[in-house]
Amino acid sequence: MSTIARRGFHYMQRLNSANVSPALLEKAQNRVIDAALTFIRERAKFKGELMRSLGGVAATSSLLGVPLGHHSSFHEGSAFAPPRIREAIWCDSTNSTTEEGKNLRDPRVITNVGDVPIEEIRDCGVDDKRLANVISESVKLVMDEDPLRPLVLGGDHSISFPVVRAVSEKLGGAVDILHFDAHPDLYHDFEGNYYSHASPFARIMEGGYARRLVQVGIRSITNDVREQVKKYGVETHEMRTLSRDRPILENLKLGEGVKGVYVSIDVDSLDPSIAPGVSHHEPGGLLFRDILNILQNLQGDIVGGDVVEYNPQRDTYDGITALVAAKLVRELAAKMSK
């Protein structure tokens, strides 16, 4: 069991040993969750009203942080990522214009809702199933406010399941997913954890929340997971076939006949020489330009996305991976907004 998971588990043990009334605990959990959702609701409402008053925008990328790291099977520092990524987005080392010419100083391109208070919710003894529901509800609150679209900052990759579920349920149907990662994240469960960061896309596919799942950068895959790939009809593009697959990947057309496209970027999809600040180093990965070429050429309406698995605790002293993650967010935000 991970350090952060143990902390939550031991806290619940202390509550149980203190004979805390289940009714009292449930009431406390409900109040804290209501307060958390009220915060997200009011922040999203304000940002939505602001975008509508400015006018001339059909979609605004809305940053929602989900600082959750306890479902990681190794290092857990991704829980500390959202504020570091936000800081790097506005770092003075670069200007505010994206490669496609959008000015991030224009709030109609990118805005910020804030973070779901994951640690505070878990501190009340809320279990993983209910926590996932809180994440889903938070995403829906953002989507309630047209023209906001969720661009979620992880956190480990487990967050993609409740986020994609929310997007699909809110839009009333499945989406297509473009997924950059070193790992397929398709385990049915990992070491008994149904909500592991190694399992989100199994949850998504079995729930019918995605029609197509296109994975890019895969280079660590077990035979059991290959069976999962076959089971769910996943389109997996491994690093060993990247040269052959590049023409296909740089001309992707997704989202037709479904509710749009969701883009999930695990920072460990990149080679660790480019992005060392991740929990799981897997040599032989994508170059930064590989991701941008695929993303910038993607045809389809992007209705949501996430950038996950940046781990500040494993980054270099000057935060190079934070800058890498921030640029991924910047360029994805530019692609989403219109």
Swiss-Prot record:
Assembly description: Forms homohexamers.
Residues annotated for Mn(2+) 1 binding in this entry: 157, 181, 185, 266
Protein name: Arginase, mitochondrial
Family per similarity comment: Belongs to the arginase family.
Binding-site list for substrate: 191-193, 309
Entry keywords, A to Z: Arginine metabolism, Hydrolase, Manganese, Metal-binding, Mitochondrion, Putrescine biosynthesis, Transit peptide
PANTHER family in the cross-refs: ARGINASE/AGMATINASE (PTHR11358), GUANIDINO ACID HYDROLASE, MITOCHONDRIAL (PTHR11358:SF26)
Entry GO terms, CC: mitochondrion
Free-text function comment from the UniProt entry: Catalyzes the hydrolysis of L-arginine to urea and L-ornithine. The latter can be utilized in the urea cycle or as a precursor for the synthesis of both polyamines and proline. Possesses agmatinase activity. Catalyzes the formation of putrescine from agmatine.
Co-factor: note: Binds 2 manganese ions per subunit.
GO process annotations (BP): arginine catabolic process to ornithine; protein hexamerization; putrescine biosynthetic process from arginine, via agmatine; urea cycle
Gene name linked to the record: ARGAH
